[in-house]
Amino acid sequence: GASTSILVDAHPHIGTDKLPRVIENMRNTIIQCGGEVHFETRMDALLIEKDEVKGIETNTGKTFLGPVILATGHSARDVYRWLAANNVEIEAKGIAVGVRLEHPATLIDQIQYHNRNGRGKYLPAAEYSFVNQVDGRGVYSFCMCPGGFVVPAASGPEQIVVNGMSPSNRGSRWSNSGMVVELRPEDIEQFTIDNLQFTISMQHDSAANCQLPTVNSQLSMMYFQEYLERLCWQQGNMKQTAPAQRMADFTKKKLSYDLPETSYAPGLVSSPLHFWMPSFIAERLSKGFQLFGKYSR
């Protein structure tokens, strides 16, 4: 379903508008090869006998026996909670946390093509890639969406998560990318339990039928992620308007009194990200922004 240009492009791009057809074709290929796809079906438990996984039990009551691969993706947090509650060995992994930057596409074109007139008629919307080390942790751009949009991507209630997408023609007036800080489990060990209280303290997970682990557990990074997503929601007036700040104001630690036009449909609310974001993230982001500004000249 994608353009044939992905076979030769250095940075192949399918386009969000074409992804549904691509996914449908992938699903049909799996079925043609003898696989099955079960919609509206959730794994509720692993079937374990003598410390060996024998299969799964689903919300429909049906069981599937045989080897199991948990391809959980980004947000299947109920699976991780079940595993921790049932003594399946898992461990915390590093994550990357940050913000999404948005600029006029014409500005990025001018910078990257070194031409004040931009890209002209024949060149594609310009991309960039930024990677650096700040205080012993990586600060880098990812998922750069030239000619794209910033979109809401929360997977649960009382969360704000944003992502980027580009249509196949990369034709919007904006370009955006994630700018994130590398985090390791040891980075949040000193993060106060009070900040995570709403997530982990004396909660009862009905799906796992167990008491949730403490912050210093194999789920600590997941709880920290949930904390940040809810904090963003609170700072966004408890709806899907995203808290935002101009990059220059973030580095100067001052509130933005106005915000530029955005592709993010729910809208923005000015917020002092530098103040409420955990300092070990905000300080590295600030230094990264300053390096990015020099890189982008």
List each language-model region with its residue ranges.
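Residues forming the flavin
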Residues: 1-194, 200-208, 213-297
